[in-house]
């Protein structure tokens, strides 16, 4: 077919509406605080895939966009949430048949003795076919300091599937950026098959406070203005501590604050309780954290 003389047309707006990917992108905006660079990158990937679909409809050759991805960033920055939305986008655009997300770590793929790794990895891949396989902390698959480690066998099987069955499965490798960079350097064959790299920045203290307020609202709780100020101080201190995990750490802190609130209420058995009493986190419920002692 001559591209220049073809009179075929395709309506971008109609195709865009039919795929309903705008709903997914809107959900992403609504559910995730901040992360503008991540949202922009996901929109770019979605646009590329939609254009590729339109090209195929007009009989043009597919650009064969690489679908395997790398999500890098600290824990609790929304990588799994975005992976779930990406699976939905890929499904709505027809790149995968089912659209489900399977999340695994090294333990789900690698066996402890000879002959155990291949069946474990193949079973995971079988379960993930037609969807997206999200491998968290993927760098733990590769342990060059241990010659008897079976992670390399799992990587080899993943490579074969990424190359030969890329129409049926998308793999997302995830983890800390520095460790993932070393992982790709050590496994160039794998790195060459990962076309889309998305970096997830850490949240700011103010963004984490907003996330915390949303988490509480979803459980029909609220913080007093004074409690919000104290919780912001808590976040700033907690960010300086080891093992900080962004939104995950915020959720854990709020769970403990609700526990202290319940104990505070329980300590006044004679008091008649209002709805406000039951839904409100006070500053003292946060100040009793060890970070303030």
Swiss-Prot record:
Domain of life: Eukaryota
Subcellular location field: Plastid, Chloroplast
SMART domains: AAA
Record keyword rRNA-binding present: no
Resulting phenotype, residue 113 to A: Increases ATPase activity and reduces activase activity 5-fold
InterPro entries: AAA+_ATPase, AAA_lid_6, ATPase_AAA_core, CbxX/CfqX_mono, CbxX/CfxQ, CbxX/CfxQ_RuBisCO_ESX, P-loop_NTPase
UniProt keywords, alphabetically: ATP-binding, Chloroplast, Nucleotide-binding, Plastid
Coiled coil: none
Binding site for ATP: 75-82
Chief place of localization: plastid
GO cellular component, one term: chloroplast
GO MF terms held by the record: ATP binding; ATP hydrolysis activity
Subunit structure: Forms homooligomers. Forms heterohexameric rings with the nuclear-encoded Rca subunit consisting of 3 of each nuclear- and plastidial-encoded subunits that alternate in the ring.
Similarity comment: family membership: Belongs to the CbxX/CfxQ family.
Function, in words: Required for the expression of ribulose 1,5-bisphosphate carboxylase/oxygenase (RuBisCo). ATPase involved in the activation of red-type RuBisCo, which tends to form inactive complexes with its substrate ribulose 1,5-bisphosphate (RuBP). Catalyzes the release of RuBP from inhibited RuBisCo in an ATP-dependent manner. Activation of RuBisCO involves the ATP-dependent carboxylation of the epsilon-amino group of lysine leading to a carbamate structure. The nuclear-encoded subunit plays a more critical role in activase function than the plastidial-encoded subunit.
The name this protein goes by in its record: Ribulose bisphosphate carboxylase/oxygenase activase, chloroplastic
Organism: Cyanidioschyzon merolae (strain NIES-3377 / 10D)
Gene behind this protein: Rca
């Amino acid at each position: 077919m001559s591209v220049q003389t073809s009179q075929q047309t395709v309506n971008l707006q109609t195709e865009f509406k039919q795929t309903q990917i705008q709903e997914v992108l809107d959900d992403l905006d609504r559910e995730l605080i901040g992360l503008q660079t991540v949202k922009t990158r996901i929109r770019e990937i979605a646009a590329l895939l939609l254009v590729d679909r339109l090209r195929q409809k007009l009989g043009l050759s597919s650009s064969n966009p690489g679908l395997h991805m790398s999500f890098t960033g600290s824990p609790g920055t929304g990588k799994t949430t975005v992976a779930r939305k990406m699976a939905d986008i890929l499904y709505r655009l027809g790149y995968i048949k089912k659209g489900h997300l399977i999340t695994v770590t090294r333990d789900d793929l690698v066996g402890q003795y000879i002959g155990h790794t291949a069946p474990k990895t193949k079973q995971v891949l079988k379960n993930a076919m037609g969807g997206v396989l999200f491998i968290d902390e993927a760098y733990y698959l590769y342990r060059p300091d241990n010659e008897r480690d079976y992670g390399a066998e799992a990587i080899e099987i993943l490579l074969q599937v990424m190359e030969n069955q890329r129409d049926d499965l998308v793999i997302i490798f995830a983890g800390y950026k520095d460790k993932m960079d070393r992982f790709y350097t050590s496994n160039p064959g794998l790195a060459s098959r990962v076309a889309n790299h998305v970096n997830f920045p850490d949240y700011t203290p103010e963004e984490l406070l907003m996330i915390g307020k949303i988490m509480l609202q979803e459980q029909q709780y609220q913080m007093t203005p004074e409690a919000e100020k104290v919780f912001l101080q808590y976040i700033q201190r907690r960010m300086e501590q080891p093992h900080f995990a962004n939104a995950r750490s915020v959720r854990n802190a709020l769970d403990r604050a609700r526990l202290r609130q319940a104990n505070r209420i329980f300590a006044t058995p004679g008091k008649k309780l209002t709805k406000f009493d039951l839904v409100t986190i006070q500053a003292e419920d946060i100040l009793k954290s060890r970070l303030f002692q």
